C-alpha cells in the first residue's frame, strides 16, 4: 500500500536488497501500484544491489544471476541508484542494465571516518581488487597504504601474501573492502598481519553482509569492525543518507557505456 498521492510525481522506492528473494516481489507490487495511480516515474534506490557477485557461470548449469536480475529490474523501474556495486567483471552498470543508473561511491565517507576515529592508520587492501579503493582512501587522508595478494582455492579457502610491513609497525592497520560476506579473506588477512607483529587491525567495509558465522568469527580478530548503513547491521557507523539524498536531488546519473 502506498501512502500519499503518486499521481504526477516521481516515486523513489528505497530498499536495500540484502534479502532479495522476498523483497523484490514486494517492490514489483509497489512499482506497479505507483504506475497505476499515475506516477510519472518509478525508480529503485538500492544501497546494496543483490546478485552482482554471480557475474559468470562458475559451475555448469548455473544461472548468471547478475544478468537475469538486471533484466528484471530494468523491466520494472525507470532508473536505478546504488552504492558501490560489485563490478568485478563488468565495466559499469550500463553493461547490464538498460535503464539509467546512478553509481555512488562510499570511499570518501570511509576515508573521513577513518581520519576521525583511527590514530595513525595504515590503509590495507586485502586483495588486488581493492588496490584502487585502498589507494584512494589513503590519498584522501594523507596516510600510507599497502595491498595484499590473494589466491583462492575454492569458495571458502584463500591464501594471502603480505608484503613486509615492518616499517609501519607504529601504525594501526585498517583493512578496507566493499563487501564482507564469508569473511574468509578478512580473517586470513588479520592473522597474517598479526604474524608480522602489527597492531590489532581495524576493518571498515561498505556492505556488511556477514554470512553464516562470519561476524562471530571476525570480531575477535579486529579491534573494531565498522560498516556503512547500506546493509543494516550492528557494525553500522557510517551513514549514507546525505550521499544518496544529494544524488537524488541533483538527478545525477552514470554516463552510458
What is each stretch, according to the model?
Residues 1-257:
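PRPP-associated nucleotide enzymes
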Amino acid at each position: 500500500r502506498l501512502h500519499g498521492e503518486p499521481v504526477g510525481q516521481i516515486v523513489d522506492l528505497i530498499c536495500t536488497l540484502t534479502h532479495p528473494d522476498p523483497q523484490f516481489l514486494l517492490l514489483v507490487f509497489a512499482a506497479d501500484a505507483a504506475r497505476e495511480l499515475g506516477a510519472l516515474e518509478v525508480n529503485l534506490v538500492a544501497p546494496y544491489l543483490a546478485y552482482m557477485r554471480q557475474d559468470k557461470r562458475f559451475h555448469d548449469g548455473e544461472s548468471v544471476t547478475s544478468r537475469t536480475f538486471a533484466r528484471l529490474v530494468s523491466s520494472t523501474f525507470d532508473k536505478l541508484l546504488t552504492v558501490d556495486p560489485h563490478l568485478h567483471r563488468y565495466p559499469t552498470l550500463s553493461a547490464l542494465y538498460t535503464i539509467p543508473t546512478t553509481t555512488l561511491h562510499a570511499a570518501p565517507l570511509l576515508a573521513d571516518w577513518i581520519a576521525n576515529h583511527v590514530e595513525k592508520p595504515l590503509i590495507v587492501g586485502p586483495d588486488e581488487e581493492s588496490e584502487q579503493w585502498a589507494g584512494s582512501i589513503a590519498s584522501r587522508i594523507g596516510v600510507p597504504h599497502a595491498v595484499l595478494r590473494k589466491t583462492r582455492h575454492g569458495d571458502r579457502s584463500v591464501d594471502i601474501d603480505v608484503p613486509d610491513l615492518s616499517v609501519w609497525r607504529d601504525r594501526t592497520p585498517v583493512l578496507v573492502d566493499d563487501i564482507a560476506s564469508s569473511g574468509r579473506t578478512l580473517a586470513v588477512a588479520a592473522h597474517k598481519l598479526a604474524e608480522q607483529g602489527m597492531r590489532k587491525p581495524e576493518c571498515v567495509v561498505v556492505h556488511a553482509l556477514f554470512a553464516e558465522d562470519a561476524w562471530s568469527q571476525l570480531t575477535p580478530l579486529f579491534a573494531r569492525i565498522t560498516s556503512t548503513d547500506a546493509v543494516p547491521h550492528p557494525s553500522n557507523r557510517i551513514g549514507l543518507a546525505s550521499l544518496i539524498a544529494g544524488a537524488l536531488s541533483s538527478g545525477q546519473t552514470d554516463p552510458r557505456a
